[in-house]
């Protein structure tokens, strides 16, 4: 009797519905919900959780402020170079500035975690928007056409994170929408093979994505796809051992020929709060003081660059963090 009671209790505990909100099954039943899930994929580049600058984080066990996607990407890309240095002594920062980081560096771990948070949630979205899945759910032809566009955007965002993985880490674990769900050890893909996969993925979606003039602000367009390809081709010799400079020129020319972009007449305008009007930005990660609050992103880049002898109000801020500086070599 005891054994039977335990068995029944356990069975019920394994068959629970979320106490709050919808289950993923319920979410993906309704075609109108997909744009909200897509928004979450984009938000992964700008937000660190569900409650503004902190609270209900996407990644547990790590500070939401310093682990925000753009903040850690900038730290890894710029602090080891002549572009910038940070005067803070927070754990991990001096090592980045002195080119003495290791796999244990908190910013290296944060970047890796952000990348491999973005990729799996994109995989789920891509799987749920497969033609087979949409047909099984009974979505109309019009709904399926719209969701195919969303799927292309999700594939772009996944390719972007894989590009960061390839650029920063080299040989990395590889998972896609066909990978099993649950805990398993994914196979590692070689850097050159990942380059080829990203290239193939981007070329497969470039004509599905909207043109730059038609794409809503902050959403991936054909030009964003071309820009990422050009960026990859520029350093192809590093990633694969074979240069692709002509391909870089070809895809850069596609952006120019599109006619939607040009260098801003005022360079400073590219970095201002109203830079959504700038003709220079091809793919923005959107930040807003009300709706996308974070201690990373542009909040970090601006506040951390304001020193003690600078007037923060000149830069539209209430205070400065007195951290980031450029180096004499760069000047």
Where in the sequence are the language-model features?
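Short linear capping/connector segments at secondary-structure termini
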Residues: 20-23, 137-143, 176-183
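Conserved, well-structured interaction surfaces
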Residues: 35, 43-49, 80-169, 185, ...
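Short coil/turn and helix-start
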Residues: 134-138, 174, 239-243
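Bacterial N-terminal signal peptides
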Residues: 1-7
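Conserved beta-strand positions that form and line the central face of beta-propeller blades
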Residues: 9, 27, 173, 185
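Short, well-structured active-site flanking segments
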Residues: 15-17, 166-177, 245-246
